[in-house]
């Protein structure tokens, strides 16, 4: 019986799929859940080049709520098919495309946590109050999950809280805003007009 001498290799299939990088990119104009993006990363009517899924989440939020067209694109291009680059213009402005203030009362806390099944809530506007006294709970902590917004709070009295907030209203985003235009006074393009830049 003989021995094999030297080095040998075998090749097996892998679960890791490498991203496909195109010579050209796809151009998307749409809406993104900017309520889940850090303020310094929020972009409205600016072209952002995305090369990775990490960049997509950093600038345009997660893909839990597919009511947002940019979230749909990120899911398809980066999560499903891993195709890059993607050029994205968000037209959703949290200052313009939102509802009036809403309230929810008597939210029960379980182990100090309440879950709001809402991915459009604007956390910048969220106010958490004690149910019994209506006193603001300033040290409440929030975290986004696939279920919605988790609120962690410790009321001094009882196990219920009230909240006030505004939320994104996608019905206020118009076709005209998506098509965009050129503003002579600011010398800036918006929407699809940014394709010329």
Label each PLM-derived region with a short phrase.
Residues 1-197:
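Surface-exposed assembly/interface segments
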């Amino acid at each position: 019986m003989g021995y094999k001498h030297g080095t040998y290799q075998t090749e097996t299939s892998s679960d890791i799929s490498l991203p496909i990088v195109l010579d050209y990119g796809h151009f998307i104009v749409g809406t993104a859940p900017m309520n889940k993006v850090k303020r310094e990363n929020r972009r409205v009517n600016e072209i952002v080049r995305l090369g990775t899924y990490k960049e997509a989440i950093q600038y345009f939020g997660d893909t839990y709520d597919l009511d947002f067209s940019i979230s749909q694109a990120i899911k398809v291009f980066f999560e499903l098919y891993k195709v890059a680059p993607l050029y994205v213009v968000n037209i959703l402005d949290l200052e313009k495309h939102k509802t009036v203030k809403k309230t929810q009362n008597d939210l029960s806390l379980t182990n100090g946590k309440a879950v709001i099944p809402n991915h459009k809530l604007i956390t910048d506007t969220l106010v958490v109050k004690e149910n019994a006294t209506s006193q603001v709970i300033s040290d409440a902590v929030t975290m986004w999950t696939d279920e919605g917004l988790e609120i962690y709070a410790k009321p001094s009295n009882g196990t219920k809280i009230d909240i006030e907030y505004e939320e994104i209203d996608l019905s206020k985003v118009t076709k005209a805003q998506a098509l965009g235009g050129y503003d002579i006074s600011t010398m800036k393009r918006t929407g699809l007009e940014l394709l010329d830049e």
